[in-house]
């Protein structure tokens, strides 16, 4: 089991779902400092309390942050290094969903310009701004193992026509990750990507706004061959990629859960 003792991590979208699960697991593995950012501060206190129970030694710093702002992302990453003197790893989990459901055919005619821009702004631009800022601060730190993990989605592979913006943003996230990985590998920074399948997070019901319950959503996806996974499973893959145990791996996009072949 990889140890994260004495290490400093930054997690976007860290207050709920996969991001929160990643923060909790990093603390369980002994992380010294976890700096999490999220657009909503609602869960900050409860997550800090949860982490304190599992590992009182882990320092948790929460920042309200909109990853659509490149300047604010830069400031956040710079403040982490200024305060803690290092940044060993980062996971860019922040993202938003797109409601599917039944729409008229062809669905591209119903793709809303504002929704298209909003989703790509968070899911693609936010990942780009975050990864760029992380590379910027990491490259000037002393030599050592440094790793960045971005979160794409099963939607990058499934070609579902009623979530154009979401699928496009996640496909682009995966492509961006592999390009950055090749670019910064010789700087001692590994960059990888995970693509979760259907995952039980607070975002899941947003994909199916017409469903009456979470169980209905799970049953629907199961009937399509996609059983619903849990955030902890994705977090374990992210933490492995952040750890030295995964040092041979860079530029990968790892499917987690039920995904198309």
Swiss-Prot record:
Active site: 166, 170
Residues the record lists as binding NADP(+): 18, 66, 132, 166, 170, 201
Keywords, sorted A to Z: Alkaloid metabolism, Glycoprotein, NADP, Oxidoreductase, Signal
Pfam families, A to Z: adh_short_C2
Alphabetical list of InterPro entries matching this protein: NAD(P)-bd_dom_sf, SDR_fam
Pathway: Alkaloid biosynthesis; ergot alkaloid biosynthesis
GO molecular function terms noted in the UniProt entry: oxidoreductase activity
Cleavable signal peptide: 1-20
GO BP annotations, alphabetical order: indole alkaloid biosynthetic process
Domain of life: Eukaryota
SUPFAM superfamilies: NAD(P)-binding Rossmann-fold domains
Its biological purpose: Chanoclavine-I dehydrogenase; part of the gene cluster that mediates the biosynthesis of fungal ergot alkaloid. DmaW catalyzes the first step of ergot alkaloid biosynthesis by condensing dimethylallyl diphosphate (DMAP) and tryptophan to form 4-dimethylallyl-L-tryptophan. The second step is catalyzed by the methyltransferase easF that methylates 4-dimethylallyl-L-tryptophan in the presence of S-adenosyl-L-methionine, resulting in the formation of 4-dimethylallyl-L-abrine.
Family according to the record: Belongs to the short-chain dehydrogenases/reductases (SDR) family.
Protein known as: Chanoclavine-I dehydrogenase easD
């Amino acid at each position: 089991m990889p140890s994260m003792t004495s290490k400093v991590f930054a997690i976007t979208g860290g207050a709920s779902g996969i991001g929160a699960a990643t923060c909790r697991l990093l603390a369980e593995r002994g992380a010294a400092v976890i700096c999490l950012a999220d657009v909503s501060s609602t869960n900050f206190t409860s997550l800090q309390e949860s982490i304190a129970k599992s590992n009182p030694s882990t320092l948790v710093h929460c920042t309200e942050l909109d990853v659509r702002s490149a300047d604010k992302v830069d400031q956040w990453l710079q403040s982490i290094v200024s305060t803690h003197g290092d940044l060993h790893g980062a996971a860019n989990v922040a993202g938003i969903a797109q409601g599917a459901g039944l729409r008229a055919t062809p669905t591209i005619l119903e793709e809303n310009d504002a929704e298209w821009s909003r989703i790509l702004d968070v899911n693609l631009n936010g990942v780009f701004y975050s990864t760029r800022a992380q590379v910027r601060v990491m490259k000037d730190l002393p030599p050592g193992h440094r790793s960045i993990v971005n979160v794409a989605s099963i939607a990058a592979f499934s070609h579902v026509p009623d979530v154009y913006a979401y699928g496009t943003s996640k496909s682009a996230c995966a492509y961006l990750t592999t390009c950055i990985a090749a670019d910064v590998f010789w700087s001692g920074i590994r960059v990888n990507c995970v693509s979760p399948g259907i995952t039980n997070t607070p975002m899941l019901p947003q994909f199916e706004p017409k469903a009456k319950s979470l169980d209905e959503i799970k049953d629907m996806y199961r009937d399509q061959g996609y059983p619903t996974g849990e955030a902890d499973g994705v977090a374990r893959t992210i933490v492995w990629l952040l750890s030295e145990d995964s040092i041979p791996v860079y530029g990968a996009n790892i499917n987690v859960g039920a995904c198309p072949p």
